[in-house]
Amino acid sequence: MGKPAPVCGSCVCGDVAVEIDFPAFWAWHDHSAATRLAHGAAYATYVGCWRSRVRITQGEAGLTRFVADGTARSFCARCGTPILYERDHSPRMVNLPRALFSSRTGREPRYHVGIEQAPDWAYGGDRLAPLKGFPGVLWARPRRRKRADSAAP
């Protein structure tokens, strides 16, 4: 049996393409404020890989970087898709948004990082009901008010 095929991913516009060796080293959900702002979402799911197992296969010149507080985030300069998340304290590791990859990366998220920074509006797993007339859209159905009992004294 040979070496598993690499896992390929890309940004929204397709200008930047990456590949990682299968399997990724780890995966987690990041709820930190910095990640929330970088992704424009309540949290992001990342896969972490050894730097030697990550390759930019297309569009490296099309990456732009933002560096602050010991972290570097690389984005596609054309469409803004987050591509790489690197930290000074772990220079041999590179983290990539899980959403870049349409196929399996070999790791399922096992950790929640920065959960104490999760916003109060983030979805917490409450059961949602289908929204009538909009297939695939779920909503939190308002609770019915109890009617006043007319027979009560």
Question: Model-found features: residue ranges?
Answer:
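A short Gly-Trp-Pro
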Residues: 1-153
